[in-house]
């Protein structure tokens, strides 16, 4: 028979300021996820760069007008978004819903958070008129890592990974025109249809898998697994075509897979006074010798460390795009490399 005499503990009837403070203290005691970044990163490091990119440093504030949201706060919103692979709408909801997200942003319950449109506009502002904001912010953090002795350039690994864009449903004729660098009729940039079409992304095939989008070509510090440079291209661009743009005289040794092996690449390494550790490959009637195989085996163990970088990026959904166009792809890839470095930096500083 049902026992009506049992009494259970009741939930707190109403929230007050002390309940909220107690909840905040409980959350702050456990530092995990994105909040580990705030333990090791001084966000004010980016303020001057952000204000310069956005033109705030040159703006005449005496003319009035609605003041913008703090650019450092907006930058942290983008970091939060990339770290968790969120869309603009999802990011807005999660900032309102999750206390840990508000804590990361330095906000309190009840305070206004940037909406999806504001997030979109801020990303656009970083890249507008060739500002290349994501690149400049990446370089600012890379400079801090170098000055802190975390990037030694004793050995660098060069490799590339696909970043898939939303697939297009075009006719064969339209695809042929796009491949020739032309915009098909009705695909004008300002038209309703044109705004949904990516005429910059390209198809590529690797290991029997088809990819549509772009490539993230990176140079990674072999010891710390930090990205030191990157280049964005269409997916059909061969890895070897950007080798010279990534490798410079600052690198003491360079490791890469056999896709980068060419006389041009080796000449560039000689010009930069870099040790050559590009994987060797055999040819018809000229197979690899036992010594060559032994050399490849030794370097491949180190070169494989770059796959850990791409693996972590994939976990954070950085290997796919929600937008169209190369300019936005470049922003996504630049910010992805930056946020990966922040995550890696937090791991190294444990």
Give the positions of each predicted feature.
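Charged, often Cys/His-bearing segments associated with DNA-binding zinc-finger transcription factors
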Residues: 1-48, 52, 350
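Short hydrophobic/aromatic-enriched beta-strand-loop microsegments
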Residues: 272-280
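Secondary-structure capping and boundary motifs in well-ordered enzyme cores
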Residues: 42, 65-73, 111-115, 298, ...
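Basic, amphipathic alpha-helical segments enriched in Lys/Arg and hydrophobic/aromatic residues
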Residues: 272-273, 292-350
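Polybasic low-complexity intrinsically disordered regions
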Residues: 89, 93-96, 107, 114-271
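Acidic, metal-coordinating catalytic cores used for nucleic-acid/nucleotide bond scission
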Residues: 65-69, 255-264, 282-284
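Basic, short loop/linker segments at the boundary and entry of helix-turn-helix/winged-helix-like folds
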Residues: 35-79, 83-84, 118
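Short, charged, surface-exposed secondary-structure boundary motifs
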Residues: 241, 264, 285-292
């Amino acid at each position: 028979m049902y026992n009506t005499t049992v009494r259970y503990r009741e939930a707190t009837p109403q929230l007050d300021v002390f309940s909220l403070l107690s909840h905040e203290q409980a959350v702050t005691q456990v530092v995990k996820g994105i909040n580990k970044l705030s333990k090791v990163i001084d966000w004010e490091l980016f303020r001057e760069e952000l204000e310069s990119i956005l033109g705030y440093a040159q703006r005449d504030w005496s003319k009035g007008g609605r003041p913008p949201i703090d650019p450092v706060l907006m930058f942290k919103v983008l970091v939060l978004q990339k770290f968790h692979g969120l869309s603009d709408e999802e990011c807005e909801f999660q900032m309102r819903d999750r206390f840990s997200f508000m804590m990361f942003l330095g906000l309190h319950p009840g305070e206004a958070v940037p909406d999806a449109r504001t997030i979109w506009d801020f990303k656009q502002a970083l890249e507008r008129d060739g500002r290349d904001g994501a690149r400049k912010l990446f370089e600012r953090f890379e400079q801090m890592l170098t000055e802190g002795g975390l990037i030694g350039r004793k050995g660098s690994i060069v490799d590339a990974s696909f970043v898939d864009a939303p697939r297009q449903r075009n006719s064969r004729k339209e695809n042929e025109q796009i491949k020739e660098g032309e915009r098909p009729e009705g695909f004008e940039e300002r038209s309703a249809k044109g705004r949904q079409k990516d005429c910059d992304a390209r198809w590529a095939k690797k290991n029997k898998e088809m990819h549509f989008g772009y490539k993230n070509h990176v140079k990674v510090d072999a010891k710390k697994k930090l990205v030191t440079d990157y280049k964005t291209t269409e997916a059909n661009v061969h890895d070897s075509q950007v080798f010279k743009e990534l490798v410079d005289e600052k690198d003491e040794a360079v490791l890469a897979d056999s896709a980068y092996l060419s006389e041009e690449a080796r000449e560039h390494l000689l010009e930069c006074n870099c040790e050559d550790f590009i994987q060797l490959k055999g040819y018809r009637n000229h197979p690899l010798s036992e010594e060559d195989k032994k050399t490849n085996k030794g370097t491949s163990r180190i070169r494989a460390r770059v796959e850990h970088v791409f693996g972590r990026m994939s976990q954070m959904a950085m290997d796919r795009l929600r937008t169209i166009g190369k300019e936005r792809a470049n922003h996504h890839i630049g910010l992805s490399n930056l946020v990966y470095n922040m995550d890696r930096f937090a791991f190294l500083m444990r």
